[in-house]
């Protein structure tokens, strides 16, 4: 779990499950950061404590339903399944995003799980590529992956030149800009 921030909305099991989901959506390692290394779980937790607070019940019910599905399929809660098993479960859920309950063969858990997986997928993307001020994208990992230099006051003529490698520009966050501005006063 993250060293940058305390988890406040999730209990330890829920946090481990959502973090495992995010880590399969954007896998990584220490040398090639993914969602786990970029602290996406911190972003999701902070979002649920704030603007996305209305989604807390979805996350709680979603984790419970995902664990039931994982136990039925693989005999263990989702966070304890192998990466291959997690990939298979998530792949199935994301392939059929939020099927209607009146669809033949779709039960309440399947509909809930597909919607839940889609929301976690969206929040994982937000947490990986949003400004680090919101809890995820630790050290600009997502921005570095894209070659995006982050928040800027502007660009030089050289940086605007066609073919310029923006990966040469140091990553700058909103907090970096605030510090720069405060230093000018």
Regions from the language model: what does each represent?
Residues 24:
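Substrate-recognition/specificity elements adjacent to catalytic centers across diverse enzyme folds
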